[in-house]
């Protein structure tokens, strides 16, 4: 039985620029997608667009070779409900750690920990969101968000 090729465009993929989560250079992803009948591909690396120049150069090369393929530029960003609440929780966990160190537990079997307030998992709780540029203005907006995210508290 021969399988019919369906039109498919992957809108979320990681290259080697997503440390610990992706592999292969953008051009390898593009060649693979094109070789499997796709006419476009979005690479959405974690928190950066470091592969964009590779995408752009390879797309030009593919076009020169007569291949109909469109790179889609994007990023996988992280979303938290409230940066202020996150900062408060981080500060509270830090204070709880300091207080726990100050309490002398050598004469008892007491464990000093408030499991509800000292849950580090709450600090790493975040949602992923894929941002794709529809046009030049969208690309500029993504650049701006990424740039701002690398300043201050590493959030935007």
Which stretches of residues belong to each language-model region?
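Phosphodiester-processing cores and adjacent nucleic acid-binding clamps
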Residues: 1-156
């Amino acid at each position: 039985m021969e399988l019919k090729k369906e039109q498919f465009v992957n809108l979320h993929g990681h290259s080697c620029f997503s440390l610990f989560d992706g592999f292969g250079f953008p051009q390898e992803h593009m060649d693979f997608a094109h070789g499997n009948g796709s006419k476009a591909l979005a690479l959405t690396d974690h928190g950066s667009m470091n592969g964009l120049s590779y995408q752009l150069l390879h797309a030009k090369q593919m076009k020169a070779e007569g291949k109909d393929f469109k790179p889609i530029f994007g990023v996988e960003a992280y979303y938290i409900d409230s940066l202020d609440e996150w900062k408060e929780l981080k500060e509270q966990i830090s204070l709880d750690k300091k207080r726990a160190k100050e309490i002398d537990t050598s004469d008892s079997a007491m464990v000093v920990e408030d499991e509800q307030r000292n849950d580090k998992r709450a600090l790493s709780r975040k949602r992923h969101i894929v941002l794709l540029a529809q046009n030049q203005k969208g690309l500029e907006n993504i650049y701006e968000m990424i740039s701002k995210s690398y300043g201050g508290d590493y959030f935007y």
